[in-house]
Amino acid sequence: MTERSMLLELKQVGYRTATTKIVNNISFTLQRGEFKLITGPSGCGKSTLLKMVASLISPDIGVILFEGQDITTLSPEAYRQQVSYCVQTPALFGDTVYDNLIFPWQIRHQRPQPTAFADDLARFELPETILQKPIAALSGGEKQRIALIRNLQFLPKILLLDEITSALDEHNKRNVNDIIHRYVRDKQVAVLWVTHDKDEIQHADKVITLTPSAGEMQEARYERA
């Protein structure tokens, strides 16, 4: 087994509102090619934790390191290309699917590889003709898959996924789970995935469980049968 390099480290991270501790004293690491799930009941701070890692909100205490650097010292634009965040309700823009998939390449001032879109669309069981489909004509499941494909165009080192299969039927949910699992192994991308779905645990290297009382965190390795 090749040695994994550390991409992300959280050290005693916490976040609170004026009256409530949402997340408290969270510490863990994420290595290249590692697949971690974050689970727990509603309101225990799962999405807040992911937003802090995405640098959308800042922790009140503690530090988050990306490749050894405090993320508050990094360019937000550059960081978010390497750490890609995909949410439960995807925000697509422009007129067509193509407008969304070309966007990450435009930011990098690069041309996409000739088969970049076709390969990823095929992985997610979407036809290449969908590139010209209006955003308004997409189903909820199509929007979620397109948003995920768009995130992959950034060629990220870390994928942050927040309940991304919630709008999918069972077939597409299993398909997305399998695709992400293979993508992690093939590209050595790290994944931090917030989910309520116990079926997704089978792909995880480790599972982080947050409890309703902030400050309680359990981390367990998932033992495959």
Where are these regions (language model features)?
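Conserved ABC transporter NBD signature motif
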Residues: 62-70, 79
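Hydrophobic anchor residue at the start of the ABC signature
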Residues: 147-148
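Conserved ABC ATPase "signature" region
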Residues: 114-130
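Helix-to-loop junction immediately C-terminal to a conserved catalytic motif
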Residues: 54
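Conserved catalytic motifs of ABC-family nucleotide-binding domains
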Residues: 90-99, 108
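Conserved ABC ATPase signature
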Residues: 134-138, 142
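Catalytic Walker B motif of ABC-type/P-loop ATPase nucleotide-binding domains
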Residues: 159-163
